[in-house]
Amino acid sequence: MGLSFTYFDVINAPKFAGLHNYITLLTGDEVFMKYVLPNTVLYAIVVGIGGYILSFLMAWLLAQGTPRIRTVYALAMYTPSMVGQVLITVIWKTIFSGDQTGLANAYLQKFGIIDQPIQWLISSDYFMPIMIFVSLWSSMGIGFLSMLSGILNIDQELYEAAYVDGIKNRAQEIIYITVPSMKPQMLFGAVMAIVNAFNMGWIGVALAGANPTPDYSG
């Protein structure tokens, strides 16, 4: 971080440059302003906020099931966050392979939706949506389990009392009982969502197999 405020090379010692490097980056780098910054903002918003909301909704839905079903599905949803980068890359590059052996192309051609295979991971039109989808798929980690634990630990008598006091549906139940009763877990989930959003940039490079990604799309 400190070096970003200096000018240096392999020969001379760093010299303090103030905000010059940042000004140059924001005003002189066309690629950064046109592609990198908008894509980063879009990715952070969708994966960060979207992953946070999705984690809560999935946790709430699982909490409504039986313990056995809940355990199986929770494990299935948490597993992607535990597998390594190599396995995630192999799985999704197999699905979105650009030839007829790719699962996405194979099924779309089988049902007559497309005539020719789509180059999913080469086309900038598809790359960012795929990157976001894979990131959301692998984002059900500690934050998700924390929310699930928070929901399961809410005193059921609160819900019973709320319905006596006038709560009429599940939406009001979530707004007035569930969320206020699990604020620590919600805060922890928010922190983890932010951390995950900034730690998943490797997914784009892994899917594309190169850096930069196609047309700087991811």
Regions from the language model: what does each represent?
Residues 1-218:
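A structural signal for multi-pass alpha-helical bundles of membrane permease subunits
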